[in-house]
Amino acid sequence: MNKALLPLLLCCFIFPASGKDAGWQWYNEKINPKEKENKPVPAAPRQEPDIMQKLAALQTATKRALYEAILYPGVDNFVKYFRLQNYWAQQAGLFTMSARKAMLAHPELDYNLQYSHYNGTVRNQLAADQAQQRQAIAKLAEHYGIMFFYRGQDPIDGQLAQVINGFRDTYGLSVIPVSVDGVINPLLPDSRTDQGQAQRLGVKYFPAMMLVDPKQGSVRPLSYGFISQDDLAKQFLNVSEDFKPNF
């Protein structure tokens, strides 16, 4: 081969190799990027009305139906009202049944376990209550002296003196009666006249029963005003337990 043609041949092989693949350029169309699809925004879920709003709406609808049935009597108006009324009755029945079912699942919530509401158990329940009251009276009597401040000329105080007398006999309780006006009630012949005890103990309202701790020099009110014997026994229990609720 002519040495003069060799460089020319090399150039023919080199230039096509360094260029782009022109043979496919007619097919390589410019691809436009796809536009981002706008997906529809899902509709917000429908919110249920607040329970208080729902209750108020039902109550208003029931009242309105009742008033319409009264002011504009007719079959349609009455049926509209009565259907709403039956709805309330049905819901009340479901509530009652769910409560009974709940008491079986959670007996600790059943009030009937502590205080039976059946008439047949009243006698036993009263006996248990009275036993607690007796224990409370005995407990307080061990730590406190019991003083009864009264006015001998007041008829209500005189009526309470009868209760105090009966209470002392029933429970064997020692009570010190004190007349603040100097008039001794004949039902309480062991009464003392007030020599400043009421003022020292801070008793300003009468009649009054006070618990006095001679060791500590403290005083606790037990009752003011007239009170029956049964309620006085309950009051001893309440004071001894610092008025702890029994429900």
Curated annotation (Swiss-Prot):
Q: Which UniProt keywords apply?
A: Conjugation, Periplasm, Plasmid, Signal
Where does it localize?
Periplasm
Q: What is its main location?
A: periplasm
Q: Keyword Signal: yes or no?
A: yes
* Pfam families listed in its UniProt record: TraF
What does UniProt give as the signal peptide span? Answer: 1-19
**Top-level taxon of the source organism:** Bacteria
GO cellular-component terms in the record? periplasmic space
Q: Tell me the function of this protein.
A: Involved in F pilus assembly.
What is the official name of this protein in its record? Protein TraF
Q: Which organism is it from?
A: Escherichia coli (strain K12)
